[in-house]
Amino acid sequence: MLHTITTITEEIVNLLKDDPVRPEIPATDRINSNSRIYMLKDGEQTKAITCVKFLEAVPTGVEDMVGLVESATTAVFYTIWSYRPGAGRDLIIAAQKSIEAEFPRIQTYVTLSPKTEMARRFHLKNGARELRENHSTINYIYK
């Protein structure tokens, strides 16, 4: 079941320590009026987590995700990790559906991914295409 995290709890802070991509981003930057954490759970067991920032444009780096915006049109999946095989894919699909329902102005779904073969395989296998290669990141776009 999908959970949308909008408040910081001790459980969330502990789970964020497992973030393999962007562990340096504090919980307060992951949960605010322009940011959400989506968690896929099976009962009490966490299956996968992704963090999403809502912006007005596609970022090229983490520094582009600072601050709040008034009229976001882009959902940026900037980190994802799973505790079970296949859960990351299920989470991307469920989170996108949830965002579509909650934020109808969001038109673009992209990632801010590290330049790794693992990230490339994951996103291309799950229906994304490469949008843009940046200095230290790659943006993949989901339809």
Model-predicted segments: where are they?
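Conserved beta-strand-loop-alpha-helix junction that forms the acyl-donor binding cleft
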Residues: S82, Y109-R121
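A short helix-loop-beta-strand connector motif used in the catalytic cores of GNAT acetyltransferases and
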Residues: A27-A48, K53-E56
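Conserved catalytic-core motifs of GNAT/GCN5-like acyltransferases
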Residues: R129-I141
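Short, aromatic/basic amphipathic alpha-helical patches
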Residues: R121-R129
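Conserved acyl-donor/pantetheine-binding loop and adjacent beta-alpha core of acyl/acetyltransferases
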Residues: C51-A75
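Conserved acetyl-CoA-binding loop-helix of GNAT-fold acetyltransferases
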Residues: S82-A101, K125
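Short amphipathic alpha-helix that is part of the acyltransferase structural core
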Residues: M1-D29
